[in-house]
C-alpha cells in the first residue's frame, strides 16, 4: 500500500555555497519531500539520502492516477520501517541532479542560459553542505537519523563525519569509503558512451543524447545486479521475438538492458548523469585526512552498516574496512552482512532483509 498523495517542495537559497573545488555555487534550489509530522522538540527528523539517479520522491504518489510510487515507498508510512506516526521523514534531491535541485539543467543566473558544462564539479560533501542549508531552513538542528544506500550511504557518512553535532545516528547500506579502480573504470566507459554520442555536442545539446545515455545506463545497470540474479531472471534464454541465427537477434538479457536504458533517457539528463558519476568517482570519506581513523575521529553518532554478499560494485570488504576503523576508535558501530542474490541493488529490492535490524537500531537511539 502506497504512502498516499505527496507534494514536492522547492527551497530557494540566495546564499552562495563554497564548493570543495573552491568554486562558488548560488543561488541554490533544493527539491524535497516530507512525510509525517515534526514533533514539538524537533527531535524526530530522519533524512533519507538517495542514490545516483534517485530523487526526492521517496514515497507516495503525486496524483491518484500516477502509476509508480516513490522509489522506496515500501519503507515509509504508518507502521513501516520509517513510521510516519513516529518520525518526520525528509528526502531531498542532491545538487547536480535533474529533479528540481540546482544542477547542469538549471539556468545560470550570470548568462540566463542553462549551465550545461559551465556547472561546477560537485562532490558528495558539497551535496551534504547543501542539505545542511535545508535542515537550517526547516528548523532542524539535529537529525534523529541519516539513512541511505550507495551514494546515499556516502552522504550519511559525510553527515556523520562533517556535521557530527547534527546527527543522532546513521544507517549506511551498500556503500564504500572510496570507489575502487574497477568502479571508476566502469563509470569511465559509461562516460565514453555519452561523449561519443554525436548529439551530446560537448554538453550543449537541446535534446538528450539518447543513444549514449541509454548505453551508459546499461553499463551502470549491470553493476547494480549480480551474476546470480541475472542467471535466475534471464539465464541464456534467447528472445522469442528473434530467430536464434538472426545477426541482430538478442538474448532476453539484451532486450532487458535495451528497454531499461531507453526508458531511463526519458526521465534523466545526460549532463546530470555525468556530474553525479564524477562525484561518485571523486568520493573519499577520508579526503583531507591521512587515514580512515582520522576521518572517523569526529564521529559521535552510532552507525549501523549493511553490506550484501553479492554486491561486487561495493563489496562487503569495503564496508568491513570502515567498521574496523570505527571499532579501533571505540565508536558505536554495528555491522550486518546480508545474504542476497540481488547484488548492489539488494538494499532497494530486499528491504525486508534488514527492516527488523534497522527498527531495533532506531529504537535504541538516544538524541
Swiss-Prot record:
Substrate binds at residues 217, 345. It catalyses: L-homoserine + acetyl-CoA = O-acetyl-L-homoserine + CoA. Belongs to the AB hydrolase superfamily. MetX family. Pfam families: Abhydrolase_1. It comes from the Bacteria. This is Homoserine O-acetyltransferase. It comes from Citrifermentans bemidjiense (strain ATCC BAA-1014 / DSM 16622 / JCM 12645 / Bem). Keywords: Acyltransferase, Amino-acid biosynthesis, Cytoplasm, Methionine biosynthesis, Transferase. Gene3D superfamilies: 1.10.1740.110, alpha/beta hydrolase (3.40.50.1820). Residues 44-350 form the AB hydrolase-1 domain. Homodimer. The keyword Transport does not apply. Disulfide bonds: none annotated. GO terms for biological process: homoserine metabolic process; methionine biosynthetic process. Transfers an acetyl group from acetyl-CoA to L-homoserine, forming acetyl-L-homoserine. InterPro entries: AB_hydrolase_1, AB_hydrolase_fold, HAT_MetX-like. The gene is metXA. GO terms for molecular function: homoserine O-acetyltransferase activity. It is found in: Cytoplasm. Pathway: Amino-acid biosynthesis; L-methionine biosynthesis via de novo pathway; O-acetyl-L-homoserine from L-homoserine: step 1/1. One of its GO terms (cellular component) is cytoplasm. The active site is at 150 (nucleophile), 311, 344. Its EC number is 2.3.1.31.
Amino acid at each position: 500500500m502506497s504512502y498516499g498523495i505527496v507534494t514536492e517542495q522547492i527551497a530557494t537559497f540566495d546564499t552562495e555555497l563554497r564548493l570543495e573545488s573552491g568554486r562558488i555555487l548560488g543561488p541554490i534550489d533544493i527539491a524535497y519531500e516530507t512525510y509525517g509530522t515534526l514533533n514539538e522538540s524537533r527531535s524526530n527528523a530522519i533524512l533519507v539520502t538517495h542514490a545516483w539517479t534517485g530523487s526526492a520522491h521517496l514515497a507516495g504518489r503525486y496524483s491518484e492516477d500516477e502509476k509508480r510510487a516513490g522509489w522506496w515507498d515500501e519503507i515509509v508510512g504508518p507502521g513501516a520501517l520509517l513510521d510516519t506516526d513516529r518520525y518526520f521523514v525528509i528526502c531531498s534531491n542532491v545538487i547536480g541532479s535533474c529533479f528540481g535541485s540546482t544542477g547542469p539543467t538549471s539556468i545560470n543566473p550570470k548568462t540566463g542560459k542553462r549551465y550545461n558544462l559551465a556547472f561546477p564539479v560537485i562532490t558528495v560533501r558539497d551535496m551534504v553542505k547543501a542539505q545542511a542549508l535545508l535542515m537550517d531552513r526547516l528548523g532542524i538542528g539535529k537529525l534523529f537519523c541519516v539513512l541511505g544506500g550507495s551514494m546515499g550511504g556516502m552522504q550519511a557518512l559525510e553527515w556523520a563525519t562533517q556535521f557530527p553535532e547534527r546527527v543522532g545516528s546513521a544507517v549506511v547500506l551498500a556503500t564504500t569509503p572510496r570507489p575502487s579502480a574497477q568502479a571508476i573504470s566502469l563509470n569511465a566507459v559509461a562516460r565514453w558512451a555519452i561523449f561519443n554520442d554525436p548529439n551530446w555536442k560537448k554538453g550543449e545539446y537541446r535534446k538528450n543524447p539518447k543513444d549514449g545515455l541509454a548505453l551508459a545506463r546499461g553499463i551502470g545497470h549491470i553493476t547494480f545486479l549480480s551474476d546470480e540474479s541475472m542467471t535466475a531472471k534471464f539465464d541464456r534464454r534467447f528472445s522469442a521475438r528473434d530467430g536464434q541465427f538472426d545477426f541482430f537477434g538478442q538474448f532476453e538479457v539484451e532486450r532487458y538492458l535495451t528497454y531499461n536504458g531507453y526508458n531511463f533517457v526519458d526521465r534523466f539528463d545526460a549532463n546530470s548523469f555525468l556530474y553525479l558519476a564524477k562525484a561518485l568517482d571523486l568520493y573519499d570519506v577520508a579526503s583531507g585526512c591521512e587515514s580512515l581513523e582520522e576521518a572517523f575521529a569526529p564521529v559521535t553518532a552510532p552507525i549501523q552498516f549493511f553490506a550484501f554478499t553479492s554486491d561486487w560494485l561495493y563489496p562487503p570488504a569495503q564496508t568491513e574496512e570502515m567498521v574496523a576503523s570505527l571499532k579501533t576508535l571505540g565508536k558505536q558501530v554495528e555491522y550486518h552482512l546480508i545474504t542476497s542474490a540481488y547484488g548492489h541493488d539488494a538494499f532497494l529490492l530486499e528491504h525486508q532483509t534488514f527492516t527488523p535490524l534497522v527498527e531495533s537500531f532506531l529504537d535504541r537511539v538516544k538524541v
